[in-house]
Structures are given as C-alpha cells and as structure tokens.
Amino acid sequence: MSTSGPRAFSSRFASFIDKVRWSLLQQQKSNMDNMFESYINNLRDVDEAYMNKVELESRLEGLTDEINFLRQIHEEEIRSLDMDSIIAEVRHGDDLRRLALDIEIATYRK
C-alpha cells in the first residue's frame, strides 16, 4: 500500500496540475479574446477617423476652389469698377472742358 499511496498522490497531483494548466490556458484565451476585440475596435476607430479625414480634406479642397473662384470674380469686378470710374472721370473732364469752351464762346459772342 505504500507504493499506491505515493502513486495515487502523484496521479492526483498530476491531475491537479493539469486542471491548473487548463484553467490558465482558458484565462489566457479569454485575455487574448479581449485583447483582439480591443485591437479590432481600435482598428475600426482608426478607419473611421481616416474616412472623416478624407471627407474633410475633400470638403476643404472644394471650399478652397470656391474661394479662389470668388476671389477671381471679385478682382474682375474691382477692375471693372476701376475702369468705370476712370471712364466717368474722363467724361466728367470732357464735360467740364466743353462747358468751359461754351462759356468762353458765349463770352466772345457778346
């Protein structure tokens, strides 16, 4: 019986060690599952952030194009207004010269 005692103890101890190993493996698997799930969620967040970045860059490009277009139109309108102002000044100057000439002619006719 003395041999069966140590063998039985050894067998029970080996069984206990196997159970502990199995429990540790299950915990590791559970921890890895959580880790992979967290990793996948992080990848989804990164993907969403990248898609938002692409959308914002596209909107920025469109707004920049619109600003450049409006700036060009504004500059053309300013040039046109400047030309209109110059033309008005020339016409006003011509009108004043004609008026002065008419006054001078009227003065000589008297």
Swiss-Prot record:
Residues with N6-acetyllysine modification: 53
Domain IF rod: 1-110
Statement: the UniProt record of this protein carries the keyword Glycoprotein: yes
Name used for this protein in its record: Keratin, type II cytoskeletal 8
Function of the protein: Together with KRT19, helps to link the contractile apparatus to dystrophin at the costameres of striated muscle.
In-chain residues carrying the UniProt-annotated modification Omega-N-methylarginine: 12
Entry annotated with the keyword Heme: no
Annotated GO CC locations: cytoplasm; intermediate filament; nuclear matrix; nucleoplasm
Region Coil 2, residue ranges: 87-110
Matching Gene3D superfamilies: Vasodilator-stimulated phosphoprotein
Ranges for region Linker 12: 80-86
Compartments (UniProt record): Cytoplasm; Nucleus, Nucleoplasm; Nucleus matrix
Quaternary structure (record): Heterotetramer of two type I and two type II keratins. Forms a heterodimer with KRT18. Associates with KRT20. Interacts with PNN. When associated with KRT19, interacts with DMD. Interacts with TCHP. Interacts with APEX1. Interacts with GPER1. Interacts with EPPK1. Interacts with PKP1 and PKP2.
Taxonomic source organism: Mesocricetus auratus (Golden hamster)
Chain intervals for the UniProt region annotation (Necessary for interaction with PNN): 88-99
Cross-link (Glycyl lysine isopeptide (Lys-Gly) (interchain with G-Cter in SUMO2)): 29, 110
Family membership: Belongs to the intermediate filament family.
Entry-linked InterPro entries: IF_rod_dom
Covalent S-S links between cysteines: none
Domain of life of the source: Eukaryota
Post-translational modification: O-glycosylated. O-GlcNAcylation at multiple sites increases solubility, and decreases stability by inducing proteasomal degradation. O-glycosylated (O-GlcNAcylated), in a cell cycle-dependent manner.
Renumbered residue ranges of the record's region Linker 1: 26-39
